[in-house]
Amino acid sequence: MGGIVGKPESATSTWMPETKLEAKMVEAMQRRAAEGTALKSFNSIILKFPKIDDSLRNCKAIFEKFDEDSNGTIDHEELKKCFHKLEIKFTEEEINDLFEACDINKDMGMKFNEFIVLLCLVYLLKDDPTALRALEATFETLVDAFVFLDKNKDGYVSRSEMTQAVTESGEGSTGRIAIKRFEEMDWDKNGMVNFKEFLFAFTRWCGVGENEDEEEGEEKN
């Protein structure tokens, strides 16, 4: 996401967000980056995977509650009802932007992993989302992880920043690991990763969504 003006890994002003939502994400992440991070290594992020996974799976009850037709996805109307019930105050335009951004398959419905990404974006963009307080620690860890990777604090993670973050752990074969992880995040292949792309990759790393797909397959057999 975003457009290049000059080299993609230079100063903040050379990388321009393509949408209002992306611009808001970048601005919010830059503010958060100014506060710093307690994480010291990429390994410290990996060690948090199991705990984060368990916490995110607790969102399943919320997801199923608002998936009123039980088709495994939340459509636009169900999302608006969800926001109203959780007292998340967004404008119609903001809801539309969030839905479009998180519906990566463009099938007019959000699967569980897409719903998790949306809730985390809500957490990032709202100053005090009290409705999400139960997930605050988990979402803050995800924000913290992105801040750790974003070495120049411009709101994006570049390939060189990912390599630096992974190689700091000092283990062997870290260069290949860094490139693989970066490619998993950079799904639009533009050389820069925003927070949304990071979240989708992180849910895959933790296994969120994979087990749900397997369970659906078993039910059909």
Residue ranges and their predicted role:
Residues 140-176, 180:
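Eukaryotic modular interaction domains in large regulatory/scaffold proteins
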Residues 2-70, 76-80, 91-101, 106-149, ...:
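EF-hand Ca2+-binding helix-loop-helix modules
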Residues 72, 108, 154-155, 191:
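Acidic, glycine-anchored loop motifs typical of Ca2+
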Residues 181-189:
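Long amphipathic alpha-helical assembly cores
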